Design a protein with these regions (language model features):
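Conserved small/polar residues in nucleotide/adenosyl-binding loops
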Residues: 294-304
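N-terminal active-site segment of His-dependent metallophosphoesterases
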Residues: 1-68, 72
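Short, surface-exposed connector motifs at secondary-structure boundaries
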Residues: 71-79, 292
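Divalent metal-coordination and catalytic microenvironments
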Residues: 8, 48, 82, 126, ...
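Hydrophobic anchor at the start of a short beta-strand
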Residues: 77, 167, 261
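Binuclear metal-dependent phosphoesterase catalytic core
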Residues: 112-125, 129, 229-291
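His/Asp/Glu-rich metal-coordinating catalytic cores
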Residues: 55, 84-226
Length: 305
């Protein structure tokens, strides 16, 4: 199976006052083109589909358009809630949408939502684990020994895949690889916690046995510990420290007994740029016209921009 792994769409997001919905639609149109070009058979959306729990109507319509286009192409969608999403709202009409091969997991109840698809090698099972906090797992699994985020996710996942079992995990958590935290950017809500050392995380070893673990939560694309545990990253730059970064979608070739991820570059409608210089130069007409999204850092300390 060819699985396209996306995460952290943050539909409805604004950066420095700029509405990014046209940019987000442009990227989603590219995703549809990638699906056609690479014979994509399923799409994973690993959380933070919206930027807020109450997204603007235009963002909801954009997601509706995207899911409808995938349904018309007979491409199943496997989507989970992230920490920016409203789990309850994302679950709305989940039963009806399943009939169109759109599988949503908003709220955690007692176990990941399990979806079984067929490919040329037989059954391929997807475990959909939405963003969950230890307190929620304690409430749903009162007999489990929950000490921290790592033990909470271990309990939430339940039994790991056995030998010969073909399973893929979709999750939205902070994950450690080899004892190291992933590289974060300023647009993530966890960035401040990482900077002060208070973040809780899950050990990537918890995902042993899965053919592939499709992660969301971190906006820089990267593997965690091994190539088959991966953050897709956000499809657009959402903070200045990401300016110039190459964004991508992950095409995962899932075989009989393993998976091989491949990065497919995404091209933004507008590049985010960080300019420095004298105030009069930065505010000159030719500079303003040439740049779409900029952060102006003036040499004059009294300037307010």
């Amino acid at each position: 199976m060819n699985l396209l792994h996306l995460a952290d769409l943050h539909l409805g997001k604004r950066v420095n006052g700029f509405d990014l919905l046209p940019d987000q639609r442009y990227i989603l149109e590219q995703v549809l083109d990638l699906c056609a070009a690479h014979n994509v058979q399923a799409v994973a959306l690993a959380g933070d589909i919206y930027d807020t729990a109450l997204p603007p109507a235009a963002a909801v319509l954009l997601l509706d358009w995207f899911l409808t286009e995938l349904a018309h192409r007979n491409i199943p969608v496997l989507a989970i809630a992230g920490n920016h999403d409203s789990a309850e709202r994302l679950d709305y009409a989940a039963g009806l949408l399943s009939n169109q091969q759109v599988y949503l997991a908003g709220q955690f109840t007692s176990a990941p939502r399990r979806v079984i698809l067929q490919d040329e090698f037989g059954e391929l099972t997807f475990d959909l684990l939405p963003f969950v906090r230890p307190a929620t797992v304690r409430h749903c699994l009162p007999d489990a020994d929950i000490r921290d985020e790592d033990s909470a996710i271990a309990a939430a996942l339940g039994p790991l895949p056995t030998a010969g079992e073909r399973r893929v995990l979709i999750a939205h958590q902070m994950v450690l690889g080899g004892g190291s935290l992933p590289t974060c950017s300023g647009s993530e809500s966890v960035a401040a916690d990482v900077n002060v050392g208070t973040v809780q995380a899950v050990d990537a070893a918890r995902f042993t046995g899965y053919l592939y673990t499709a992660l969301g939560h971190i906006h820089r694309p990267q593997q965690v510990g091994c190539p088959t545990v991966r953050y897709a990253g956000s499809p657009l730059c959402y903070s200045l420290d990401e300016s110039g970064a190459q964004k991508s979608a992950v095409l995962v070739h899932i075989g009989a007994n393993g998976a091989e991820p491949e990065l497919l570059p995404l091209r933004p409608l507008h590049a985010m740029r960080h300019l420095t210089g004298p105030l009069n130069q930065l505010t000159a007409a030719d500079t303003v016209t040439a740049v779409s999204y900029t952060h102006l850092r003036a040499h004059e300390t009294s300037a307010h921009l």
